[in-house]
Structures are given as structure tokens and as C-alpha cells.
Amino acid sequence: MSDINASRLPAWLATCPCVGDDVNPTLSRGESLC
């Protein structure tokens, strides 16, 4: 992983609640960005 990816990882986790139904659309967007 590059430093850029390492910097974006915590930011993505912060935007991803990973709880409830919100995890579904958020996870899909996260995979698309990656």
C-alpha cells in the first residue's frame, strides 16, 4: 500500500458506519473507490 492509500483508509472507515442498512451503500461506494 502507498502512503496515499494508508491516508485514505482511516478516512473511509470514518465515513463508513458499518452498522445498520447504511453499511450496504457505503460499502459499495468504498469498493468502487478502491
Curated annotation (Swiss-Prot):
Coiled coil: none annotated. Transmembrane segments: none annotated. InterPro entries: Amanitin/phalloidin. Processed by the macrocyclase-peptidase enzyme POPB to yield a toxic cyclic heptapeptide. POPB first removes 10 residues from the N-terminus. Conformational trapping of the remaining peptide forces the enzyme to release this intermediate rather than proceed to macrocyclization. The enzyme rebinds the remaining peptide in a different conformation and catalyzes macrocyclization of the N-terminal 7 residues. It comes from the Eukaryota. The keyword Phosphoprotein does not apply. One of its GO terms (molecular function) is toxin activity. The keyword Transcription regulation does not apply. Residues 1-10, 18-34 form a propeptide. There is a cross-link at W12-C16 (2'-cysteinyl-6'-hydroxytryptophan sulfoxide (Trp-Cys)). There is a cross-link at A11-P17 (Cyclopeptide (Ala-Pro)). Keywords: Thioether bond, Toxin. Toxin that belongs to the bicyclic heptapeptides called phallotoxins. Although structurally related to amatoxins, phallotoxins have a different mode of action, which is the stabilization of F-actin. Phallotoxins are poisonous when administered parenterally, but not orally because of poor absorption. Belongs to the MSDIN fungal toxin family. NCBIfam families: amanitin. This is Phalloidin proprotein. The lineage of its organism: Eukaryota, Fungi, Dikarya, Basidiomycota, Agaricomycotina.
